[in-house]
């Protein structure tokens, strides 16, 4: 019962903070705003989180994990139906992330450019990442650097998406997407 109550309070604060961060922005949201929306005492906040930025990191990790997992799982489904070369898998994976972030621009208020936070954050994410890396190795990639390569790809995509989707500068996503795909293909070949 006590554990369940603690989980409810934590979830309530995470949900309240997520809503506030995506609507107002992190800098414009105070801890007072969060506890008021979550209907908990301010002291309760500090039992669960060091400060507002600890909360931001946890939400960013959770959200980036969800995006990456969704992309990798969708890629797995697509490959079961229609096997594809690794470079095509990369484009599929990146396309999914781009489309998701274009549909959920407000996530950039939390994620900023840090999409890779969730890459190896959970066992499920690690397993999905390993499946992706197996494809890289199967096509001649170095097993010792497969996870590093995935990290670099996600970092590059996250930073590019932030600039092109959230800021629309120096290029929009439509303008930069072909160059991004060319660069990604060159990196893994």
Regions found by a protein language model. Give the residues of each.
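A short, Lys/Arg-enriched amphipathic alpha-helix from helix-turn-helix/homeodomain DNA-binding modules
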Residues: 10-19, 65, 69-72, 91
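Short hydrophobic/aromatic patch on the recognition helix
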Residues: 39-49
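Amphipathic alpha-helical packing segments from all-alpha helical-bundle domains
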Residues: 69, 99-103, 116-151
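Hydrophobic/aromatic-rich alpha-helical bundle segments in the mid-to-C-terminal region
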Residues: 108-113, 138-183
């Amino acid at each position: 019962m006590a554990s369940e109550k603690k989980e409810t309070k934590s979830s309530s604060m995470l949900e309240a903070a997520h809503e506030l961060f995506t609507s107002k922005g992190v800098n414009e949201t105070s801890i007072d705003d969060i506890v008021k929306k979550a209907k908990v005492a301010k002291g309760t906040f500090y039992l669960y989180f060091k400060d507002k930025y600890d909360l931001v990191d946890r939400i960013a990790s959770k959200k980036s994990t969800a995006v990456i997992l969704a992309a990798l799982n969708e890629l797995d489904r697509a490959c079961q139906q229609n096997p594809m070369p690794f470079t095509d898998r990369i484009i599929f994976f990146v396309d999914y992330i781009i489309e998701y972030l274009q549909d959920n621009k407000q996530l950039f208020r939390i994620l900023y450019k840090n999409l890779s936070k969730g890459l190896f954050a959970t066992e499920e994410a690690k397993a999905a990442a390993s499946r992706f890396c197996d494809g890289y190795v199967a096509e001649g990639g170095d097993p010792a650097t497969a996870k590093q390569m995935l990290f670099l790809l996600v970092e590059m995509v996250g930073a590019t998406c932030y600039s092109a989707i959230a800021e629309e500068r120096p290029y929009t996503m439509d303008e930069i997407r072909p160059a991004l795909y060319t660069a990604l293909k060159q990196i893994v070949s």
